[in-house]
Structures are given as C-alpha cells and as structure tokens.
Amino acid sequence: MSDINAARLPSFFFPIPCISDDIEMVLTRGESLC
C-alpha cells in the first residue's frame, strides 16, 4: 500500500515529475511551473 500512496502523491499534486527542489517550491506555492 505504501507504493500506492507514493504514486498518489506525485499524481495528485503534480502529474509531471520535476526536480526535488521544484517539487518543494510547487508544494509551497501550490502551482506547477514545469
């Protein structure tokens, strides 16, 4: 089930995988700049 949760996080917040630094900024701002 851990895999499902890990897969949901990126899919729910941002469908496009970005750099870890970008992910933090995206989560903070709530907008994907990819």
Curated annotation (Swiss-Prot):
Keyword Disulfide bond: no
Chain positions listed as propeptide in the UniProt record: 1-10, 18-34
Cross-linked sites for Cyclopeptide (Ser-Pro): 11-17
Keywords of the record: Toxin
A GO term, aspect molecular function: toxin activity
InterPro entries referenced in this protein's UniProt entry, alphabetically: Amanitin/phalloidin
Record PTM text: Processed by the macrocyclase-peptidase enzyme POPB to yield a cyclic decapeptide. POPB first removes 10 residues from the N-terminus. Conformational trapping of the remaining peptide forces the enzyme to release this intermediate rather than proceed to macrocyclization. The enzyme rebinds the remaining peptide in a different conformation and catalyzes macrocyclization of the N-terminal 7 residues.
Annotated NCBIfam families: amanitin
UniProt function note: Cyclic heptapeptide that belongs to the MSDIN-like toxin family responsible for a large number of food poisoning cases and deaths. Cycloaminide B is non-toxic to mammals but shows immunosuppressive activity, probably through the inhibition of the action of interleukin-1 and interleukin-2.
Family: Belongs to the MSDIN fungal toxin family.
Protein name (record): Cycloamanide B proprotein
Taxon lineage: Eukaryota, Fungi, Dikarya, Basidiomycota, Agaricomycotina
